A protein has these predicted regions:
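A compositional/biophysical signature of low hydrophobicity enriched in polar/charged and small residues
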Residues: 1-79
Length: 79
């Protein structure tokens, strides 16, 4: 299963959060600094159980203000 976890961090803390994410084994290597309503996006490709664990673990990082996780939905578009 794939998911996109959008992370908002405290002002000036993007680099600090990136360093923390690098040290976490379960977090994907697909980590991007983005503009818009999120500061950082992480692409997760694992089971829904592991996605839940990762997102809950992110809540323990004090520099993270909020997260929003978009879960992949399988849709048959008939193409």
């Amino acid at each position: 299963m794939k998911a996109l976890c959008m992370i908002r961090v405290q002002p000036g803390q993007v680099d600090r959060v990136l360093e923390i994410l690098k040290r976490k084994r379960r977090v994907s290597k697909d980590v991007m600094v983005v503009s818009g309503r999120a500061d950082i996006c992480v692409i997760l490709n694992t089971s829904i159980t592991d996605i839940n664990k990762i997102v809950i673990d992110l809540k323990n990082i004090k520099e993270i203000v909020s997260t929003e996780t978009l879960i992949e939905v399988e849709v048959d578009l008939g193409w």
